[in-house]
From Swiss-Prot:
Keywords: Coiled coil, Cytoplasm, Repeat, WD repeat
GO cellular component labels: cytoplasm; FAR/SIN/STRIPAK complex; mitotic spindle pole body; nuclear envelope; old mitotic spindle pole body
GO biological process: asymmetric protein localization to old mitotic spindle pole body; negative regulation of septation initiation signaling; regulation of signal transduction
Signal peptide: none
InterPro entries according to UniProt: Striatin_N (IPR013258), WD40/YVTN_repeat-like_dom_sf (IPR015943), WD40_repeat_dom_sf (IPR036322), WD40_rpt (IPR001680), WD_repeat_striatin (IPR051488)
Protein name: Uncharacterized WD repeat-containing protein C1773.01
Length: 612
């Protein structure tokens, strides 16, 4: 009695010294982990089961091929026997000769039959070994304790192993009254036992073809009879593959674990949500009429613009030459000389010059300073070469530079002419269409496309200035309203397969035509105001269009001109006559795309990461 009391006191002291290590949060985490592990193992078993079904189907197809080959050999043997009988009936061949031929062919026939039997025996042995492999894989499963997260619908009884090695271990469903015992234990255990009898099958035993399907689905030993088909056999709770996948996703969600599929979707969503951000703006009051690209050599992105007060500004998109803290962009170079607004700017690739056309009807050639010191940047440059010949406003300029040909400067004016110039100022040719006003132009290697106010685009040969063809893309704005609403503002010729002609209109319509077939490929109304500028992405089938209110729309180059996104203007303008232009350039150094938008009040520079 004393010993029992002393032991009890020692246990109480030990219990007081040892703290309780079990907490509610720890138990919940442990149970969640065990549930996740059980669900994962169950999903792996379901996947392995599906793979085994595929393997069984492959074996069945191989068996069908072997049976077909055997049937073909039997038919061939019957045909040979029939031909032999016909030869024996022939009167021209004696019985002695037939007997000699028969004796010669008999060993060969016997050999063929023996080979066929050997092939059939080999095939059946291969199928039998495959069945042994399937039974081995299905029976060699680990002992798994299922935690009862959900109430089981059936109990599973595991019979004890017997000493007789010829007896197979089967799993028989118990009646529903055993369900209470399972719930009392809070778990049920499934034991898998290896079928030892399958390893003792001799090579002389052959599987009957009639029982092959039943043997694959429910393997039996050679000494047992076939079970009844009504008897249901199971080894684990019945779950479909879809149910197990859904259960796994639910478990992952409860444990706050992100699946690989969700990770890929989140990455794609982040890439899709990448937007343009405003980086620089010019001082308010910089009224821009036109924008062009790359006037300066080097890797720093730059552009030139013309203003209403006759000034040409050259800008650089680097943080050193701009006030990055305030987000203000400053002109790098300034040229002045036009008597009125600058309507167009063009920069050739071969020389360090800038061409500009103005409201005063003149074209001016400006030289970029070789040494761009602080003095040349701070002061206004006024020296220029004047090209005279136009009698009215010069609206568009285009530098046409083709290999092995002299470069040509093309100009479009309100005086009704399109003229070609040398870079030195000498006029080469003049294209005029009687009583028609040119509105816009675009050039390829050997032809120039000119849009007129009668709604037609006329194609001329650059060498001979001869009209090649024409097609209608808009209404005749020369007759006044309502056709003036469909007036052409700008055209762009893009080479490709096929060559396409893009047109922007006064009524906010954009159209795409096939140049060769003159067929309308796409048409879309994207704004209620006039469209003024267009710029194409370098490495993707996308382009941007600017409207007269300063807004920018991004479209895809497909049959529907799908809208991608839009940039709202900083201050929407009520008037629809305020012009704007747009430029889209890539910067390989900092891996950024730049979008320059020039409107009435300012120049805005947006950028985003380069999208391959």
């Amino acid at each position: 009695m004393k010993s029992n009391l002393s032991l009890k006191r020692q246990d109480e002291k030990r219990a007081d010294k040892e703290p309780n290590l079990y907490t509610l949060q720890g138990v919940i985490q442990y149970l969640q982990y065990e549930a996740f592990k059980n669900e994962r193992d169950h999903n792996l078993w379901e996947i392995e089961r599906a793979e085994l079904k595929i393997r069984v189907a492959q074996l069945e197809r191989e068996r069908a091929k072997l049976e077909q080959s055997l049937s073909f050999q039997q038919r061939r043997a019957e045909m040979l026997e029939k031909s032999l009988r016909e030869l024996r009936k022939d009167k021209n061949i004696s019985v002695k000769d037939l007997d000699e031929f028969h004796l010669l062919d008999k060993p060969a026939a016997n050999n063929t039959k023996a080979d066929a039997e050997a092939c059939l025996l080999k095939s059946k042995n291969y199928i039998k070994k495959s069945l042994q492999e399937i039974v081995y894989l299905t029976n060699m499963q680990p002992n798994v304790s299922w935690n009862v997260l959900q109430e089981p619908t059936r109990g599973i009884k595991v019979p004890k192993e017997s000493n007789n090695t010829q007896q197979n271990n089967q799993f028989v469903m118990e009646p529903s009254q055993n369900k209470g015992n399972v719930n009392d234990a809070n778990f049920f255990e499934v034991e898998y036992a290896r079928n030892e009898n399958m390893n003792k099958l001799s090579s002389s035993e052959l599987i009957s073809d009639d029982l092959l399907e039943d043997e694959i689905m429910k393997p039996l030993s050679s000494g047992e009879s076939l079970p009844k088909k009504e008897e249901e056999v199971t080894k684990s709770p019945s779950f479909t593959l879809d149910d197990s996948v859904a259960s796994n996703e639910q478990t992952l969600a409860q444990l706050n674990i992100e699946s690989p599929v969700d990770q890929k979707k989140s990455k794609a969503k982040k890439k899709k949500e990448q937007k343009w951000t405003l980086k620089f703006e010019s001082d308010k009051g910089t009224s821009t009429q036109c924008i062009t690209h790359q006037p300066l050599p080097g890797s720093t992105p730059s552009f030139a613009s013309g203003t209403e007060n006759g000034v040409i500004n050259v800008w650089r998109l680097d943080e050193d030459s701009n006030d990055n803290s305030m987000g203000i962009i400053k002109p790098h170079l300034t040229f002045y000389g036009h008597e009125g607004p600058v309507l167009c700017v063009c920069v050739p690739k071969a020389t360090h010059h800038i061409f500009s056309g103005g409201h005063d009807g003149t074209i001016r050639c400006w030289s970029l300073p070789a040494n761009q010191t602080s003095d040349s940047i701070s002061k206004i440059l006024t020296g220029s070469t004047i090209f005279q010949g136009h009698e009215d406003c010069v609206w568009e300029l285009f530098c046409h530079e083709v290999k092995d040909n002299n470069p040509i400067l093309l100009s479009l004016s309100s005086d009704g002419t399109v003229r070609g110039w040398k870079y030195t100022g000498e006029q080469l040719f003049k294209i005029r269409c009687d009583s028609k006003q040119p509105l816009s132009m675009s050039v390829t290697d050997s032809r120039i496309a000119i849009a007129y106010n009668d709604g037609n685009v006329r194609f001329y040969d650059l060498d001979t200035q001869i009209l090649v063809s024409q097609m209608r893309i808009a209404g005749n704005s020369a007759i006044g309203n309502p056709a003036v609403k469909d007036r052409i503002n700008k055209i762009v010729w893009k080479n490709g397969n096929p060559d396409r002609l893009y047109s922007l209109h006064e009524n906010g319509m954009v159209r795409v035509f096939d140049v060769k077939s003159e067929e309308l490929l796409a048409e879309k109304s994207i704004s209620k105001v006039s469209l003024t500028g267009i710029a194409f992405a370098v490495n993707r089938p996308e382009f941007a269009i600017s409207a007269s209110d300063g807004r920018v729309f991004f479209l895809r180059q497909d049959d529907k001109l799908s809208t991608l996104e839009s940039l709202p203007s900083r201050e929407a303008q009520e008037e629809i006559t305020d012009l704007s232009d747009i430029l889209w350039i890539n910067s390989p150094v900092d891996k950024l795309e730049h979008l320059i938008v020039g409107c009435k009040e300012r120049i805005s520079v947006y950028d985003r990461k380069y999208l391959p």
